């Protein structure tokens, strides 16, 4: 005992505390790996691609969604170890569906030429294509385009590395309440069933854009702000044995239920977009956005009542983009165009929103005192 007591010096205590801080940091980083951020480029004042990727790395953001195969961004991603959801834009869907030669060319130029230096995890063929929106003219081409890209990925020898899917929004859901009764719209079933069948057969997830903000702002009389921000103190929806305290889970689980009803019980979900604007419309405030993002990052580690476990989630978006419309769309960024954080979010720390200088300064002080 005397020997043990003899070595219990302030220096040893500092070393022990530093070790605990480093261990805690590594655990938090691992826990935050379910989170990525969407890299949109619709602004005339955004940083260059190299600066953006360095910002991802410095903030411990390990996943990125890219909406089109921008070669400048892909070059900057080389060697970064950031996992990428690579978009095939709506404007290319019809062309890719028209023949395998086009799919092979697209995969060669935008995937294989950058592999394995860029860790492409998904190809998102199209974004929010739907028979009930202005993209209905593309619906008959979507699944054929997905099939062609899937075949081209396989021919390139990357079939075990890259999954092919598409990103949809909640307009395809006909019934979402209660979540266990979730189902796709009858007038979209022909479209959805083809997608679900493809994903089931290729063991790929469905990519879903989930925005509690729009549900709340469109119906504030029926949907409360706390329920939308993950801050409801009590259960809001009792669905059999499942209890819902936040709208995000209810929306997510309604899609899972809809998938099961469409023969896709084995199909997983990746949340390909979620966010909250800080200005520009009803309910879009700095405080609401900070609260939602902080809680989303924490909640993504936990899962939903129907599907416990980490939820791979991509926050929309990295920057405020001043060329987007309407006004609301300009204010979804985690960062301002000058790379200054709007909310001091760091993805390597549990809880999401914090001042990164706190731990850095504390660790530096410990080291200086040893």
From Swiss-Prot:
Cellular-component GO terms for this entry: vacuole
Positions annotated as propeptide: 349-370
Keyword tags: Glycoprotein, Glycosidase, Hydrolase, Plant defense, Pyrrolidone carboxylic acid, Signal, Vacuole
Major localization class: other
UniProt-annotated location(s): Vacuole
Top-rank lineage group of the source organism: Eukaryota
Catalytic reaction equation(s): Hydrolysis of (1->3)-beta-D-glucosidic linkages in (1->3)-beta-D-glucans
Segment forming the signal sequence: 1-32
UniProt tissue specificity: Is expressed primarily in epidermal cell of healthy plant, and following induction by ethylene, accumulates in mesophyll cells.
Enzyme Commission code(s) on record: 3.2.1.39
Gene induction: By ethylene and salicylic acid.
Active site: 128 (proton donor), 273 (nucleophile)
Molecular function, one GO term: glucan endo-1,3-beta-D-glucosidase activity
Keyword Glycoprotein: yes
Primary enzyme class: hydrolase
InterPro entries from the UniProt entry: Glyco_hydro_17, Glyco_hydro_17_plant, Glycoside_hydrolase_SF
Modified-residue entries (Pyrrolidone carboxylic acid), positions: 33
GO annotation, biological process: carbohydrate metabolic process; defense response
List of glycosylated residues: 361
Family named by the database record: Belongs to the glycosyl hydrolase 17 family.
Reported function: Implicated in the defense of plants against pathogens.
Protein name as it appears in the record: Glucan endo-1,3-beta-glucosidase, basic vacuolar isoform GGIB50
Organism taxonomic ancestry: Eukaryota, Viridiplantae, Streptophyta, Embryophyta, Tracheophyta
């Amino acid at each position: 005992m005397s020997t043990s007591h003899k070595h219990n010096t302030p220096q040893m205590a500092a070393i022990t505390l530093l070790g605990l801080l480093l261990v805690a940091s590594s655990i938090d980083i691992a826990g935050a790996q379910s989170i990525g951020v969407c890299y949109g480029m619709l602004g005339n004042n955004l940083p260059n691609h190299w600066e953006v990727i360095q910002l991802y790395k410095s903030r411990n953001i390990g996943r990125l969604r890219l909406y089109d195969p921008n070669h400048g961004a892909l070059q900057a991603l080389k060697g970064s170890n950031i996992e990428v959801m690579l978009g095939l834009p709506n404007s290319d869907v019809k062309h890719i569906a028209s023949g395998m030669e086009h799919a092979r060319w697209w995969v060669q130029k935008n995937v294989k030429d950058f592999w394995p230096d860029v860790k492409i995890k998904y190809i998102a063929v199209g974004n929010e294509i739907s028979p009930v929106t202005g993209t209905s003219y593309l619906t008959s081409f979507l699944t054929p385009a997905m099939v062609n890209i899937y075949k081209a990925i396989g021919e390139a020898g990357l079939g075990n590395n890259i999954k092919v899917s598409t990103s949809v929004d909640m307009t395809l859901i006909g019934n979402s309440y209660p979540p266990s009764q979730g189902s796709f719209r009858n007038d979209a079933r022909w479209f959805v069933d083809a997608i679900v069948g493809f994903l089931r057969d290729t063991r790929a997830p469905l990519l879903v854009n989930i925005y509690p903000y729009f549900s709340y702002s469109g119906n504030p009389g029926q949907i409360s702000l706390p329920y939308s921000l993950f801050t409801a103190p009590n259960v809001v929806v009792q669905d059999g044995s499942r209890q819902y305290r936040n709208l995000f889970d209810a929306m997510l689980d309604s899609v899972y239920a809809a998938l099961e009803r469409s023969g896709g019980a084995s199909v997983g979900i990746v949340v390909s977009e979620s966010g909250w604007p800080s200005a520009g419309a009803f309910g879009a405030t700095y405080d609401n956005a900070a609260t939602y993002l902080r809680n989303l990052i924490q909640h993504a580690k936990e899962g939903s009542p129907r599907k416990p476990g980490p939820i791979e989630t991509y926050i929309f978006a990295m920057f405020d983009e001043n060329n987007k419309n309407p006004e609301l769309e300009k204010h979804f960024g985690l960062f301002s165009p000058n790379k200054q954080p709007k909310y001091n979010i760091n993805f390597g720390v549990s809880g999401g929103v914090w001042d990164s200088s706190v731990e850095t300064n504390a660790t530096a002080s410990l080291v200086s005192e040893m």
